[in-house]
C-alpha cells in the first residue's frame, strides 16, 4: 500500500529546522511496511529537495515556469493516484500543502476512492493559528479526516503509528 506524505517546502523559511520531523514521520511510514509516493519533503535545502524530486519524478525541467508547472502537475497526479492514505505535517503554513490536502479530501468529488487523511500539527511551533481551511474540517463532515495536535516528535510518531495500524 502506498502513502502520500506532504509538508511545507517553499513556505518553510529554513528547511533544516523541520527536516528531522519530516524524516522521522517518513521513516515511521516506511517502517510500518508502506511504500512512499515520494520523499522530497525531507530535503534540508533547495538543492537536496530538487534532487529528491528528481528521484520521484525523473528528470526535472530547467528551473523556471516549466519546472513549476511540471512539479505541480506531478504532485496532483500523485494525490489522485492509487494511494491508501495521505499524511500531512501542517505546522508550517504552505499553500502547496493546502492544495494537496484539498485534492486528497475531495477525491470522492473527482470520482476517486476516499482515503484516510492525517493532519499533524505541532502545538505552538508557528506563532499564528492554523488556517481554518484545515482546522475547520471536522470528522463529522469528513469521517476519513484525522486532525491531531502534538507536543513532541515522539507524540507525533505515536499518533502516526495508531493511524497506520487502523489502515491494516
Question: Model segments located where?
Answer:
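Conserved catalytic or regulatory cores that recognize and/or transform ribose-phosphate-containing ligands
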Residues: 1-168
